[in-house]
Structure formats: structure tokens, C-alpha cells
Amino acid sequence: EGIYMTTATDPYGEWSKPVNIRPGAGWIDPCPFWDEDGKAYLVAGVAKSRIGYKSVLHMVEMQPDGMGLIGEEKIIFDGNLNDQITIEGPKMYKRNGWYYIFAPAGGVKTGWQTVLRSKNVFGPYEYKVVMRQGDSPVNGPHQGAWVDTVTGQDWFIHFQDVYAAGRITHLQPMSWENDWPVIGVKKDGNDYGEPV
């Protein structure tokens, strides 16, 4: 059990033997992040079924080559202390001096998209719900990522759970207001977007 790292010079070629960089159960949805100064970090959620608790995000510094961790793991966000229950699936970015972690919360079928931000990689992080189902038929917008194109457009790709049909992929327009992302379209004066 743990988080493993493997490398290859060609994605179709031979992969190295996996190295367990974080032994033990519990961490899920790991996301590596390389900062402008060359330092690297690993952020991840946790699964209650494997570790006994949920709704927190952990972070630890990582060797720049990804082959090991440096220092102690830290809880950087605890969704149990606010309304971000079941926060998971973090994706980390940096923009305009802000560290951002995009993470869904509330569960796959009825959840929402939350974004955390901080000027310090280890926080403290403030958060904002940036997309909810609202009046859209797209339930629980979940497990997404920011896509910034070479032409300067921003998009958000995520899935929707549609029971027997599986997980349907959606692409939402994304823009920025006051250094917070706006995903989808805002309606009725809401502070969050809805899927289009």
C-alpha cells in the first residue's frame, strides 16, 4: 500500500520499477506540483475506508524528481471544520502569486466544486465554492481540472455521474474575478457558477 512513482523516457516505452514514495494506506487522488523555484510538493485527499477519517487534504514536500518525500506531512485543509465534507481529488496550480487547489466536495452525485487559495504553499488556505449544479441537469460537477490553452482561454474539465451511463465528461468555460475562478455561468446573482 502507498503512493508509487515510476518513470519512462517514452510513454509507450519501458517503465521503471515502481518506487513506494509514501508507504501506508489512506491517501487518494495524489497530485504533484512543481513550483517556480524548483521545489516540488504532493497534495492528496484521504479515504475513510482506508485510514479511518475523510474530508482533509494533506501536503508534503517532494524531491524534485518525484522519487521521495521531504519532511513531515501537513494537513492543509480540513473540510470537517466547515461545510466542505468529502473534499477530495485535489489539483494544484499557481497563478498571479496565488497557490490554488481545485477540489470537489459534497460527494459524487450531489457535490460541488471548491477552490482553495493561499499566498503560501502550506497555507493557511481560504476557500470558495465556485460551481454548483444549480438549475443545470449536470449533477455533482466533480473531479475536475483547469485547462489553460496556448491561446489564453481557460476551461474546466470535469465529470458528472449518470448512474448506468457512467461518468460523462463536461468542458466548462472558465474566467477569473478578483483572483478567483468562475466556472460555468453565474445566474440569478449567485456567487458561484453553474454548468452550461
Which residues does each PLM region occupy?
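Carbohydrate-active catalytic/glycan-binding domains of CAZyme proteins
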Residues: 1-196
